[in-house]
């Protein structure tokens, strides 16, 4: 085959012109040590803190320690099949989770992958797990109430939209029950709820999901689950992932409620990771930045300014204490970060007062501005009267003779305590809370036997719903008790009381 010299030059010129100079550069490193879900990698020169690192077998890791000669990574999956000498690659991305309406009603893990067997989550939007909190200019003050449906909380420790209210107490004192009732009470109120389970038993999470489904609450709820069998890095990521899912709705102008259950186990997971990464331990062996761990999470809860849509993210973090010790490291940290705390006591719980809220040391620092005026009117003296009752009850144990005024206060206190008892999964509409608290505070229950109070309460609501239906509507409409409404309430309660007392 004869090729002319000029043809050779044209072929060479053509090949030079078509030469593809696209060179793919991969920033890679080599595993020099692996074990306990932690990998030390040599290389990865320009790696970012918190960057996703691609390991063999489709496993990803997260770079947390950037040291002089290596990078410490935590694995977000199983370490089987990954060994020293394997090559890892940078992804140049940080950890993201899927967000959007498609997540509502689903149970997902810390990375947003569905674990409820209902197929993939069909959403195209992702959001970084770690996002800076809104600044001071981007926020507005908390002034709208978020009703929990629990009389003791809505009256004495009110929660507002955008607030962070800590639920703290020993194990088995009903902390999760309060959070669950609050989620159930948001039904029909256009509030998206997110329940983040950190380090819990799988059976417990399954039970919670089952209850939420049964009560119809999964229609507006996302469950993010990182159970005790998951690795420490996944437990560490869970609350941040849940928060990012909530922020998506907050920036769309919606109201969101998020429950972190619980941050004690979250701190333990972070301590595990930190010690394995050889970070220096501090008090109770927690690392020095354990305060920042929770503050950067809880500061993301806010009520956004009207310019940004006016959405809100309300947080209910849960912390477990040991033998009621609120002076331990994690409880004091979270108390100082949040806008108040609901303290649950095992003594009250075992004595049959449920929810076992200790009104003495429970407080809401910003929720008072959000409380509706009608509730303020009936609950204003409630905390003081309960405190005086407890003091008198302790004094009367010595068997000393009490004057008439003290006996009257004791009897009223017993009825107040009885009224504040409430069964689980029985949240109450705010207008009914106001009606029964009005009756209790204004001495309408003083001649009802204590053991008949619950029956009286139930039948009073039925009576008012039948004969005085407009009372509840008026309370919701005016949001305050006018003199006319008070006299109508007095008449309704007295009318029913006469019927009730004649039957017992």
From Swiss-Prot:
Gene Ontology molecular function terms on file: ADP binding; ATP binding; proton-transporting ATP synthase activity, rotational mechanism
Pfam families the UniProt entry points to: ATP-synt_ab, ATP-synt_ab_C, ATP-synt_ab_N
Residue numbers marked as site, Required for activity: 362
The EC number(s) this enzyme carries: 7.1.2.2
Catalytic activity reported: ATP + H2O + 4 H(+)(in) = ADP + phosphate + 5 H(+)(out)
Main localization, broad class: membrane
Function text: Produces ATP from ADP in the presence of a proton gradient across the membrane. The alpha chain is a regulatory subunit.
Listed name of the protein: ATP synthase subunit alpha
Organism: Clostridium botulinum (strain Langeland / NCTC 10281 / Type F)
Phylogenetic classification of the source organism: Bacteria, Bacillati, Bacillota, Clostridia, Eubacteriales
